[in-house]
From Swiss-Prot:
Belongs to the SMG8 family. The modification Phosphoserine is found at residues 115, 469, 668, 742, 895. Phosphorylated by SMG1. The keyword Cell cycle does not apply. Residues 18-41, 100-129, 278-299, 653-738 are annotated as: Disordered. Keywords: Methylation, Nonsense-mediated mRNA decay, Phosphoprotein. The lineage of its organism: Eukaryota, Metazoa, Chordata, Craniata, Vertebrata. Residues 685-706 have a biased composition (Polar residues). It holds the Pfam family Smg8_Smg9. Component of the SMG1C complex composed of SMG1, SMG8 and SMG9; the recruitment of SMG8 to SMG1 N-terminus induces a large conformational change in the SMG1 C-terminal head domain containing the catalytic domain. Forms heterodimers with SMG9; this assembly form may represent a SMG1C intermediate form. It comes from the Eukaryota. One of its GO terms (biological process) is regulation of protein kinase activity. This is Nonsense-mediated mRNA decay factor SMG8. Involved in nonsense-mediated decay (NMD) of mRNAs containing premature stop codons. Is recruited by release factors to stalled ribosomes together with SMG1 and SMG9 (forming the SMG1C protein kinase complex) and, in the SMG1C complex, is required to mediate the recruitment of SMG1 to the ribosome:SURF complex and to suppress SMG1 kinase activity until the ribosome:SURF complex locates the exon junction complex (EJC). Acts as a regulator of kinase activity.
Length: 991
């Protein structure tokens, strides 16, 4: 053979002349066959097959290819490999070169090599190259002179292929363009180990002798589990391999055992200069003494042999009967060889020294070179003489004298085993009392090619996707059998799984610590995070993610299996205390024994609330829906208390079909800042109204001169400016029911600023009740209702200037009212305030903002964050401050409990005493129960005119709900003024 080729190339090229061979027998040596492909001249040679595998270091002199160069005494593989980054192999010749050296292996082999590579070109064109995930490569070289076929395995244990695999991981080729996580990366490397084991299994099935090359002088204990894995895999796939070679022209024992003989395994260790024998100082280094009988190198070899044999015997890789073993080692021959380290660290310097020695003739060399030689012949003789020195760092054999033992060269070490094969003696490595002879067969090159090609096709090169063919079926079965390797090779995963399995119970305990019987999703996530922290402290390795996912599943199963608390929260932000349950349907009774139970929501929180008018209090359950919160509770008290009182009913949905549908939760067509614009429009108007009322009261003028209020068209006002301003203001004020309400769709929640127009709810969350006439309220005693904190049951006075024409009022121009805080031109304020008045110029109304907490305690507030305290016969403060401000929806209760959490009271009622006077008081409540973008809530009728001479009570909603969910009450450390009743809740218009 001219040079090394890939084994796949060799086998596929040989199949060309093997497949076209006539049944009559082989053609003449060197002749052509029917296909025109020349046959190799060594096809009938009986060959010894030597396989080389192992690991390589970063040093140049530790390459496995240099060993073949040394044994063959020629440069079969190049000393330097200029490898393309995309080249799959190292040192592969894709084009044959003729070797014309002496030794008889050149010219015929070159021709055969050309024919082989030429004959396989078509076959390779029909088959895709091996996938990028397989980094194992087999190369072959046949030395015709020694009749030895060398098979060299290059895998991820070699630097070149390991570098390619790392680049593939770094660039994302192994993960489909994405970087792989730790577990997948570990799986990638283990998959490469399994593919390497398949290549090793092939070598152990076709070789007589195997050389294990290791870059150090210590035995790698991981080979023990690799060989045990290979032994188990071989026993698993042996029936499949028998099927593959049953028609090959080999012996019966070969077909039965799927190998020519139990291969003999030899070990080659690299010393790397760690053990050197220095000559004495007085001794000339050019003439060293002969080695001692027991040199350190020989003692190290013997120690390694004993260690390796003892390890393999303990692990049952080697047994007494060699026929049952994966490989054998000789009992009376050396099977360990130590390659000494190189003294030349620089390969360039080594080559220069060799070139210098070839070109320089010294006296000792001139004696060895014949005198008549000159020119090229003299150079060839010198090169032949110095070839012994350039032995690829393999020491030469030293002469023996006085019976001293000498060290073998690598060729001598290997050839003592090769000669046993070529002489057909075989290996008798069985030990024990009754050793059984093992089979042995020395095949010809043609027979070996036939069997090796079949095994290569099913074990390495078979196409898994072609399951219809017999080869594809065998390949798929072999690939499925490599799972037997996991128990031997994946020690890291086995350790990681054991470690993670021990950490899992600790994580479960951390999850279940301090857990109530039923708990919510939030508690589940918090406990799961704690369990994962405990798990991550103890779990390690590639199985970390797998058991972390199992921890997730286990905790979720524990939670959902009878420990899941109902996730529903009440409108006051309290959790339902029942475990996971379903709600009763219409007409269905609750059943606690069903799975899941059928129950109503219950938070076990109870509060005390008053009815619509406030005269009667009753306990109430924590509501979970808006109807129970704002309608059902008050309807029950209506029958007992305020059912006979006068009501102003708010418009609600009146269906025109038997099955009305709720409106879909669509966003409001209004612009996003509509609420803010409305508030901006309302604030100056309300502030102007309140300020003008205050100034009018202090200056003694009527509201007829206040242009900020819209005049009542029925009042017959004579000021065109007042009418114009009033119309402009009324146009800006939003009116959500400016068109006829829908009778098909209803609003499922409450009416607010983001609701679509024309929709009404089925019930109103607001209530407006008349307690009695205006005189039913006593200014000195306050409201006579239960639940009020003493001194807080009073309404604040609101003095409203009504229009009355005095006798001496003619000198005043009502159309020219001075600016605020400025006196009337030409007159003093004190004079104006006390002149020209009658008792009916001022009408007194009363206003009260009532707050109620969950314990039923009630109190009035005279302003924002100011609880009313009346010590005498009535309040002294005016209602103007409260009417001119945004009143908080929630305020700290006047009597806090013993707990650390603050206790809030909620604005629940607005009391208004409308006097019997020529004026109108318009009610316009607007509530924003949260910070922006919380919408503004208002009743179904936005402006309600309160009839005169009455004590009216506006009951606010208990809870505020939008289509996105409830607006929960404030929690700790929250600005309470973000929850407010907007200013301008009351407006007075004189008639």
């Amino acid at each position: 053979m001219a040079g090394p080729v890939s084994l796949r190339e060799l086998l596929m090229g040989a199949s060309a002349w093997l497949g076209s061979e006539s049944p009559g027998g082989p053609s003449a040596e060197g002749g052509g066959n029917a296909a025109g492909t020349p046959e190799p001249p060594w096809r009938e040679d009986e060959i010894c097959v030597v396989g080389i595998f192992g690991k390589t270091a970063l040093r140049l002199n530790s390459e496995k290819f240099s060993l073949v160069n040394t044994v063959c005494d020629r440069q079969v593989f190049p000393l330097f490999h200029h490898q393309d980054p995309g080249d799959p192999g190292t040192g592969i010749k894709t084009k044959a070169v003729s070797v014309g050296e002496a030794g008889g292996a050149g010219d015929p082999g070159a021709a055969a090599g050309d024919s082989l590579r030429g004959g396989m070109a078509t076959a390779e064109g029909n088959r895709a190259e091996p996938g990028p995930q397989d980094f194992s490569l087999l190369q072959a070289y046949y030395n015709q002179e020694s009749k030895v076929l060398y098979l060299i395995l290059t895998s991820i244990c070699d630097n070149s292929q390991l570098l390619r695999a790392c680049r593939a991981l770094q660039s994302g080729e192994a993960g489909g363009g994405l970087s792989l996580p730790h577990a997948e990366t570990h799986e990638f490397w283990k998959h490469q180990e399994k593919l390497q084991c398949l290549s090793l299994l092939y070598l152990f099935s076709v070789c007589h002798i195997l050389l294990l090359v290791h870059p150090t002088c210590s035995f790698d204990i991981t080979y023990d589990r690799v060989f045990r894995a290979l032994d188990g895999l071989r026993q698993k796939v042996l029936p499949l391999l028998k099927t593959a070679i049953k028609d090959c022209p080999v012996g019966k024992d070969w077909k039965l055992n799927c190998r020519p003989c139990p291969p003999r395994l030899l070990f080659l260790f690299q010393l790397n200069g760690a053990l050197k024998v220095e000559p004495p100082r007085s001794q000339d280094t050019a003439h060293p003494d002969k080695p001692k009988k027991h040199s350190p190198k020989r003692r190290l070899q013997h120690a390694l042999e004993d260690q390796i044999y003892r390890i393999f015997r303990k692990s049952r890789v080697l047994t007494n009967q060699s026929i049952n073993c994966l490989f054998t080692v000789p009992a009376n021959q050396a099977f360990v060889y130590i390659v000494p380290g190189s003294q030349e660290e620089d390969p360039i310097g080594m080559l220069l020294d060799q070139l210098r020695s070839h070109c320089t003739v010294k006296d000792p060399e001139s004696l060895l070179v014949p005198a008549p030689l000159s020119g090229p012949r003299r150079y060839q003789a010198m090169r032949q003489h110095s070839r012994q020195q350039l032995s690829f760092h393999i020491d030469s054999s030293t002469s023996s004298s006085s019976g001293q033992l000498v060290d073998f060269t690598l060729r001598e070490f290997l050839w003592q085993h090769v000669e046993l094969v070529l002489s057909k003696k075989g290996f008798d490595d069985s030990v024990g009392r009754n050793p059984q002879p093992s089979h042995f067969e020395l095949p010809t090159y043609q027979k070996w090619i036939s069997a090796a090609a079949k095994l290569y096709e099913v074990a390495i090169d078979g196409k898994e996707e072609d399951l219809g063919s017999p080869t594809g079926e065998l390949t798929s079965k072999i690939l499925s059998s490599i799972k037997v390797l996991e128990g031997f090779l994946d020690i890291d995963t086995k350790f990681s799984e054991n470690r993670c399995q021990k950490a899992l119970p600790m994580a479960h305990s951390a999850y279940q610590s301090n857990l109530p019987h039923n708990y919510t999703m939030t508690v589940h996530k918090n406990q799961l995070a704690q369990a994962l922290r405990v798990y991550s402290q103890h779990a390690r390795g590639p199985a970390f993610h797998k058991y972390a996912m199992q921890l997730h599943e286990d905790c979720y199963k524990f939670w959902s299996n009878g420990h899941q608390l109902c996730e529903e929260r009440s409108l006051t932000d309290q959790h339902c205390v029942h475990k996971f349950h379903s709600l009763p349907k219409s007409g269905e009774k609750p059943e606690a024994d069903r799975n899941p139970p059928v129950l109503y929501h219950n938070s076990r929180a109870r509060s005390t609330g008053a009815c619509n008018c406030g005269r009667k209090q009753a306990p109430r359950d924590d509501p979970f829906d808006i109807k129970a919160a704002n309608y059902d509770f008050y309807q029950l008290l209506e029958e007992k208390c305020c059912g006979k009182l006068d009501h102003i009913n708010f418009p609600v949905f009146e269906p025109s079909t038997p099955d009305p549908a709720p409106a879909k939760n669509e966003p409001s067509p209004a612009p996003p800042d509509s609420d803010a614009e409305k508030l901006k429009e309302k604030e100056p108007q309300t502030q102007g109204e309140s300020t003008s009322l205050s100034l009018a009261l202090s200056l003694g003028q009527s509201t007829d001169s206040l242009g900020t209020y819209p005049a009542d068209p029925q009042a017959g006002g004579d000021n065109p400016e007042v009418h114009g301003q009033g119309e402009g203001k009324s146009e800006k004020r939003p009116n959500l029911v400016d068109r006829q309400a829908s009778t098909v769709e209803y609003l499922p929640g409450m009416l607010h600023s983001n609701c679509p127009k024309g929709l009404l709810p089925k019930f109103s969350s607001w209530s407006l009740v008349k307690l009695g006439p205006a005189k039913s309220y006593n200014f000195h005693t306050g409201l006579d209702q239960q639940g009020f904190v003493p001194g807080t049951n009073y309404l604040m006075p609101w003095d409203i200037v009504i229009r009355t024409r005095a006798e001496d009022e003619g000198d005043l121009d009502t159309n020219s009212w001075p600016a605020p805080n400025k006196a009337i031109p030409g007159k003093r304020s004190a004079v104006v305030m006390g002149r020209g008045r009658r008792r009916d110029d001022i009408a007194r109304a009363f206003v009260g903002f009532e707050y109620e907490d969950s314990r039923g305690r009630r109190f009035m507030c005279s302003g924002p964050d100011k609880v009313m305290k009346v010590m005498g016969s009535g309040p002294k403060e005016s209602a103007l401050k409260a009417l001119n401000s945004d009143m908080p929806l929630y305020i700290l209760s006047s009597s806090q409990g013993r707990g650390l959490k603050p206790h809030y009271a909620q604005l629940m009622r607005l009391f208004v005493v409308v006097p019997d006077a020529p004026l109108q008081i318009i009610l316009m409540p607007q509530v924003q129960p949260g910070p922006p973008p919380c919408p503004v809530f208002y009743p179904e009728k936005q402006e309600i005119t309160l009839p005169p001479d009455g004590l009216w009570v506006l009951r606010f909603p208990y809870a505020y709900v939008t289509e996105r969910g409830p607006c929960f009450p404030p929690k700790e450390n929250v600005q309470l003024m973000s929850y407010k009743v907007l200013r301008g809740v009351l407006k007075a218009v004189t008639q």
